[in-house]
């Protein structure tokens, strides 16, 4: 699952000061000095992995695809720039959770789901994260679409009321912002990449099989995924 590490700090690593050029620094003095933040982050992560139907489905799908996820190996609670909540580090196959910016369990659940979608894409496809912005755009579209980032409830908390086609608008906007945060490219280039892949990637609902607009939707999707797995196992 690991990729060649980037040689320059051009890929958003400035937002995650504990890693620097794709190298995890889990045991840094900074992490240890902020034990309370780290402990809370680890606890919320465990709850997310154990109880979120979004996360449980993604973990099962990755295991089925040959990419078993281990909490201690593939997740890292770290201090980050104030503008981000998490990230997927393709160079180390790690999900970074920003312990200083995630304070509620519902937020942790969404971040874990969002980043697990990137990890799932990394597992199932030959994603060229560092050189192909269209690949990055596709995964950002899928993550925004399927993670719950753009549910109506979350949009209302952002004071976005009654926008026609709000879900698609939100997905496009969040994908664009995510790309611009981690790539030193123009807005025009990012918009072009999003536009080119939007339809196909927005309609790629794997492994959920649908857009889970709520926790209840995610539970149904998880049940269907388990039943599908049992069906194929009995063939």
From Swiss-Prot:
GO biological process, alphabetically ordered: mitochondrial protein processing; mitochondrial proton-transporting ATP synthase complex assembly
InterPro entries in alphabetical order: Peptidase_M76_ATP23
Catalytic site positions: 115
Pfam families assigned to the protein according to its UniProt record, in alphabetical order: Peptidase_M76
Keyword Protease (UniProt): yes
Entry annotated with the keyword Glycoprotein: no
EC number in record: 3.4.24.-
Position of the signal peptide: none
Official protein name in the record: Mitochondrial inner membrane protease ATP23 homolog
Source superkingdom: Eukaryota
GO cellular component labels: mitochondrion
Keyword list, A-Z: Hydrolase, Metal-binding, Metalloprotease, Protease
Residues at which a divalent metal cation binds: 114, 118
